[in-house]
């Protein structure tokens, strides 16, 4: 069994297990001024699946390009799927999930989907590297919405007021182990 894992910054990884290529999130083409990651979405030659954590730009932005160029299937929450469909990804390449679904990716590779919680970077500071962050950042839903409404320095359209559709986590498994 051959396995390789490459990191492309933020939360984007390329996982290859034997002949199956899986992208975990799809954010390769950076906003202006950000350093490049060594690969653009247009340069991706092969992908079988895209597993997207939620519908924020830094997870989903290049899913349409990668799916369009490679024929990859996008597995994501319903908001991510809606945005991908609006961007022109064909329905037969879209697999909406919400958590609990086991999905066969290859003969000896499957993924289990889990619902998750997304942290809020507008919560008033980052925790120390050795401090656990378990999701309770003492910020109310109303405070979070108000802080996100400001938009900060993000270009228009990169953050939706509709939210992220709910965060998802993925566990990939085969007979040798899991990641």
What function would you assign to each model-found segment?
Residues 163-167, 174-177:
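Short gly/pro-enriched beta-turn/loop segments at secondary-structure junctions
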Residues 57, 80-81:
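Alpha-helix capping/helix-boundary segments
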Residues 14-56, 61-68, 91, 119-163:
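Pre-active-site segment of Zn-dependent metallo-hydrolases
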Residues 1-5, 16-22, 102-112, 173-179:
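Beta-strand-turn-beta hairpins that frame and shape the catalytic cleft
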């Amino acid at each position: 069994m051959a396995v390789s894992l490459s990191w492309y910054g933020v939360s984007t990884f390329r996982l290859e297990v034997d002949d199956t290529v899986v992208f975990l999130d799809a954010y390769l083409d950076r906003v202006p001024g950000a350093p490049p990651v060594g690969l653009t979405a247009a340069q991706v030659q092969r992908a079988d699946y895209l597993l997207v954590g939620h519908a924020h730009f830094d997870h989903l932005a290049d899913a349409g390009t990668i799916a369009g160029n490679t024929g990859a299937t996008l597995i994501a929450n319903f908001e991510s799927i809606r945005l991908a469909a609006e961007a022109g990804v064909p329905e037969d390449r879209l697999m909406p999930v919400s958590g609990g679904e086991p999905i066969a990716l290859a003969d000896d590779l499957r993924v289990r989907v889990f619902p998750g919680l997304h942290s809020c970077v507008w919560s008033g500071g980052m925790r120390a590297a050795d401090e656990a962050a378990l999701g309770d950042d003492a910020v109310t839903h109303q405070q979070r919405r108000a802080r996100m409404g400001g938009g900060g320095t993000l270009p228009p359209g990169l953050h939706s007021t509709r939210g992220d559709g709910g965060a998802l986590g993925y566990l990939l498994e085969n007979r040798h182990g899991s990641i």
